[in-house]
A protein has these predicted regions:
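Compositionally biased terminal segments of proteins
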Residues: 1-277
Length: 277
């Protein structure tokens, strides 16, 4: 099992390129299930605003939230079968993931990419009997429910695992819902890229803070929104607190002034959002 990346330098061009090919590949294979799944995780910023400068670092895996309501009557099993039947995907190290390898054609070792499946904690996906993949299950993540509030349909072009160029469409978590999921992730694990993704979105998306604040105010009674606000208040109380320091860790600068600058920026972005709520 490969260690979780913690720094910007851990996201190499080869790994990101391979993961993007898998994203395109999955979008093509599961085109019939487009309305039953939403891209969450590290590819969301890249897909929502691909022309941003500086560019988002991307991701080295693919995270998909599954809509249990639309995956009844055995469609969940059918979704998995479509991927497995390509011969390109196998069971991963974790119960909720499939893996594939991508040959980038550069003479280097093929890159392993993980595809992970998530669902809200309050839903159940019907299992198939006999099981297609022994021990396979989706990862339960309460905030995953936010992905299905207002997903955006995104069309994008890229290479598939085979190297063929393709244009595909996927549902992608909206900016306000993505920030909800990232806030909840902050409360449940130690992954510096969560803060990088969150702050990148607030910094680069047009009027991001205003957009998120307006959406969250309209949903102030939503428990996921209320919890997100509380988490951000706790984690970003001051520059020295956990949230801002996570951004400094991700950028991994050896210069104390630069580390302080990143932490300060994270603190200011989140505090500006909180001030509007």
């Amino acid at each position: 099992m490969t260690p979780e990346p913690r720094h910007q330098g851990d996201y190499t061009d080869r790994q990101v390129d391979a993961a993007r090919r898998v994203l395109v590949d999955v979008a093509q294979v599961l085109a019939a299930f487009r309305n039953a799944m939403v891209v969450v995780g590290g590819w969301v910023p890249d897909l929502l605003f691909p022309a941003a400068d500086p560019r988002h670092v991307g991701s080295i895996d693919v995270d998909l939230a599954l809509d249990a309501v639309k995956l009844g009557d055995g469609r969940y099993a059918e979704l998995l079968k479509l991927l497995l039947d390509t011969g390109r995907y196998d069971k991963g190290d974790k119960d909720f993931q499939l893996i594939t390898t991508v040959d980038l054609g550069d003479g280097e070792v093929p890159v392993r990419v993980e595809v992970e499946f998530l669902a809200s904690s309050d839903v159940k996906l019907k299992k198939n009997h006999p099981k297609l993949v022994e021990g396979f299950r989706v990862l339960r993540f309460p905030a995953c429910a936010a992905a299905f509030e207002h997903p955006e349909s995104i069309e994008f072009e890229g290479q598939m695992i085979s190297g063929a160029t393709n244009t595909v469409r996927l549902q992608v978590a909206s900016l306000p819902d993505f920030i909800i999921m990232k806030a909840h992730a902050l409360a449940g694990r130690d992954k510096p890229k969560d803060v990088y993704d969150l702050c990148y979105c607030l910094d680069e998306y047009p009027d991001a803070i205003g957009v998120v604040a307006a959406d969250w105010r309209s949903r102030h009674e939503d428990p996921l929104v209320a919890a997100s606000i509380q988490i951000l208040r706790e984690k970003f109380t001051a520059v020295e607190h956990y949230g801002p320091q996570q951004l400094a860790i991700f950028h991994d600068s050896t210069d104390d002034g630069e580390r302080a600058m990143h932490a300060r920026r994270a603190f200011e972005l989140v505090q500006k959002l909180l001030s509007l709520l």
